[in-house]
Amino acid sequence: MSQENTLNSGDETILAEAVAPAHAVFTLSVRPDNIGIITVDVVGDKVNTLKAKFAEQIAEILQQAQALSQLQGLVIISGKPDSFIAGADITMIAACHTAQDARILAQKGQSILAQIAAFPVPVVAAIHGACLGGGLELALACHSRICSQDDKTVLGLPEVQLGLLPGSGGTQRLPRLVGVSKALDMILTGRQVRARQALKMGLVDDVVPQDILLDVAIQRAKAGWLDKPALPWQERLLSGPLGKALLFNIVRKKTQAKTKGHYPAAERIIDVVRKGLDHGGPAGYEAEAKAFGELAMTPESAALRSLFFATTSLKKESGGKAQPRAIHRVGVLGGGLMGGGIANVTATRAGLPVRIKDINPTGINQALKYTWDTLGKRVRSKRMRPAERQRQMMLISGSTDYCGFGNVDIVVEAVFEDLSLKQQMVADIEHFAAPHTIFASNTSSLPISDIAAQAQRPEQVIGLHYFSPVDKMPLVEVIPHAKTSEETIATTVALARKQGKTAIVVADRAGFYVNRILAPYINEAARCLLDGEPIASVDKALVDFGFPVGPITLLDEVGIDVGTKIIPILVEKLGARFAAPPSFDVILKDGRKGRKNGRGFYLYPAKSSGFKWKRSPVKQVDTSVYTLLGVTPKAHLESAVIAQRCTMMMLNEAARCLDESIIRNPRDGDIGAVFGIGFPPFLGGPFRYMDSLGADKVVKTLNLLAQQYGERFEPCSLLVTMAGQQKRFYPPENSLDEAAITAHN
């Protein structure tokens, strides 16, 4: 690169400009008013990500800028329309073979950003779009930050979600900028904040419309060095010796309670932030780089990164061997909880007009109210303007007949689990909708081939299984039957992605994938209960293992009637190993459906209309369940044994699903279990976990359990074959370390 090194401030026609090669990511131009503009644009990529190979470019650009004697300020802005810098390219970690390699990688990032922080004239980050991870660390190194008031603009440090910590100074600069309590919250959760929230917490200095973002950033740079605003008194109090000791003690206890020790990055984040506050910046940066290097080599980080790469690769696949049809309008049959949720994500995330049909106007009103209420939360938190809520609400309409269905491209059916009713829905849509309209059933148990049995256009019938609550659960299963066309598959996957969902394509067999691996897990938990193990002990064992909730709690939340409805179908189609314990029927006969009717395995006190305590009462077991089941609760099994019994049933069934081509590959099986059930992410999913244990150990464990508890534990043929041939589900270079997760072995 070459650069004109002189500026004549009296002649505004002179402009210094870097002559950069076509592939340059960082380019510098200097305005007549002596403000330099550094534009970041990774050519060929949709978003900007930082790579190690860019370090020399950044250093050279900064050297060129510093050589301009009359330069008054710098503005860093993105050349992408909707993204600032989405983070660092985490594939760089794959090239690190030791903790020292990863440590050096972090130190290089720290060194480059230190040059920005020490730049002799003000450097301003003009932020529009995603400013995450390394992107936010770069912005933190700048002397000022201006961001756009736009829904696309979010700021965050999500490294903890990959089992890492911010490695380029984020753990040191953020606490000093916004205060230690706010910084710890952001770094430990990985949560993203929007523009107004970022301004309120002191993360950015101004929020402006996008069309004047650059102008305001330039004016900020011209203003010279400005005094840093004082932290709020609460944050100043927490930075003192007593406040700091109290805060870190509370944060550490809460973190340990939440992570159960399964996510080492959280503990290291607390240590590194504390190190910098207690011993100063140099010690903090050194601790940050060291911790980054060590965390990059942990099996937990490897597992979490594998999930990231898995979902990234899945998003690039259409699901079918054809191009999807364009989707302009969507229909939803049924305005209940599922139908209302599907309409919600279609309108608010996909931005598509959606027409709801329900036999009762009340159902339509409930569906509309659901979206109104969810958007209302965003309005109240200042994340959405009332006018935008109104605009999104106008995308949803309803009717008690098929008026308006003539021009929909896909209809999602969410009515009762009744085969004849669903077949009638297919016939109605084929009659009232357009010839190209796809019929997608949200069934959780009925075969799609049966639903399509009487269809005139069976190639346009498919399953689309959402999980409740629809707006929170990220997974959907796309279920083609034998006659479903590739175009229908691709179009359905495309709709799910527009709705913000992670979609896996699974075979049309009983239980599909998620419910099929969940059923034996729940059944085994029920057997532990019938063996006399207390309800709370069973749940705690699986929560300690890493699941977000225990299996008994999950059954209560889903609905005992719903959760057990699929069991007879699985028994009929797949055999007796799916049979629930016979005495478990008394739970349903007693009218217990779980939280939804206030009667389950736990007590659900009625909501009080009076004074609301800030802390909810601790959930209590309904001890009358023990009398109903005829058992005397007594904790006699170790937590590890309970967890082993339940999870081994799930692992065995997951392997069967792969062997029977229910799922297309181990990757989809891992994604389905993590996002559909809450399988511990730090284990990477059932197949990553089995690789870490080794097929031989899985088979040996299953055989021992079969000897002790019955033939339901007999290992499937695929696992036996893999154990004999010492095979893995993933290639060795993509597998977790052999010694990974020893606490779960």
From Swiss-Prot:
One annotated GO biological process: fatty acid beta-oxidation
Positions of region (Enoyl-CoA hydratase): 47-209
Gene3D superfamilies named in the record: 1.10.1040.50, 2-enoyl-CoA Hydratase, Chain A, domain 1 (3.90.226.10), NAD(P)-binding Rossmann-like Domain (3.40.50.720)
Location, primary (coarse class): cytoplasm
Locations listed in the record: Cytoplasm
Pathway annotation: Lipid metabolism; fatty acid beta-oxidation
Domain of life: Bacteria
Pfam assignment, any one: 3HCDH_N
GO cellular component: cytoplasm
Catalytic activity line of the entry: a (3S)-3-hydroxyacyl-CoA = a (2E)-enoyl-CoA + H2O; a 4-saturated-(3S)-3-hydroxyacyl-CoA = a (3E)-enoyl-CoA + H2O; a (3S)-3-hydroxyacyl-CoA + NAD(+) = a 3-oxoacyl-CoA + NADH + H(+); (3S)-3-hydroxybutanoyl-CoA = (3R)-3-hydroxybutanoyl-CoA
GO MF term (any one): NAD+ binding
Region (3-hydroxyacyl-CoA dehydrogenase): 325-745
Assembly and binders: Heterotetramer of two alpha chains (FadJ) and two beta chains (FadI).
PANTHER family xrefs: TRIFUNCTIONAL ENZYME SUBUNIT ALPHA (PTHR43612), TRIFUNCTIONAL ENZYME SUBUNIT ALPHA, MITOCHONDRIAL (PTHR43612:SF3)
Protein name: Fatty acid oxidation complex subunit alpha
